[in-house]
């Protein structure tokens, strides 16, 4: 009289694995498709936040072609002071980034103009400046003098590299002296400050440019805002140490969005050469 109900087992669909890095969350909360973000030069389409670039990415969007001459590619850091764990950290960062150090120097063209370029990479020990980074900046300036070329430096650094102690701090004087020789030769030096430009880098070559540009929202300064607040026991103004704040107070000549940065550099170089 009563039939037994039949039940069917519904097999759950196989869980689809989403590739890592396919989506990226911006600080504004927007979820961005990685390929769209890359096409937009790694600038958020919702809030215009400028994500940090690797040195290779920066070179690719700045130089006319990827066919450039890398300078001093064989220079690599060593653990000169026997700092605990430093050798292992260097090896790990070299493997992760594919770089020898936190900076790449090169000669290439921008808008057809030959230039010497130095690009720092904050993904390598926070772009900190040790002996090799300082040497690359100094040699790039000397290369520019020998070949009568303008120098463009993209800074992205947390400051001096503590694992190299006084040897790292010495790079501040060395790079400043090299930039001084470039200036004496009457050659153009454009400094581009990107997020972050802090510590010994900001206190040396980063602020010695004939023209100083910055990307929107970049953190720029010597000590971090938290350290300053704890020292002076006062609340800092909103936006303190951001690129726009520094422009308002005369420390930066212009804040230029990444999409317009290459054209701006081309105009600056062209005007300097025409003069």
Swiss-Prot record:
Keywords: ATP-binding, Cytoplasm, Fatty acid biosynthesis, Fatty acid metabolism, Lipid biosynthesis, Lipid metabolism, Metal-binding, Nucleotide-binding, Transferase, Zinc, Zinc-finger
GO biological process, one term: fatty acid biosynthetic process
UniProt binding sites for Zn(2+): 26, 28, 44, 47
Pathway: Lipid metabolism; malonyl-CoA biosynthesis; malonyl-CoA from acetyl-CoA: step 1/1
A Pfam family it matches: Carboxyl_trans
GO MF term set: acetyl-CoA carboxylase activity; ATP binding; carboxyl- or carbamoyltransferase activity; zinc ion binding
Catalytic reactions on record: N(6)-carboxybiotinyl-L-lysyl-[protein] + acetyl-CoA = N(6)-biotinyl-L-lysyl-[protein] + malonyl-CoA
Catalytic EC class: transferase
EC number(s) given by UniProt: 2.1.3.15
PROSITE patterns: COA_CT_NTER
Subcellular location: Cytoplasm
Gene3D superfamilies: 2-enoyl-CoA Hydratase, Chain A, domain 1 (3.90.226.10)
Chain ranges of zinc fingers (C4-type): 26-47
InterPro entries: AcCoA_carboxyl_beta, Acetyl_CoA_COase_Trfase_b_su, ClpP/crotonase-like_dom_sf, COA_CT_N, Znf-ACC
Family according to the record: Belongs to the AccD/PCCB family.
Subunit: Acetyl-CoA carboxylase is a heterohexamer composed of biotin carboxyl carrier protein (AccB), biotin carboxylase (AccC) and two subunits each of ACCase subunit alpha (AccA) and ACCase subunit beta (AccD).
Function noted in UniProt: Component of the acetyl coenzyme A carboxylase (ACC) complex. Biotin carboxylase (BC) catalyzes the carboxylation of biotin on its carrier protein (BCCP) and then the CO(2) group is transferred by the transcarboxylase to acetyl-CoA to form malonyl-CoA.
The name this protein goes by in its record: Acetyl-coenzyme A carboxylase carboxyl transferase subunit beta
Gene name of the record: accD
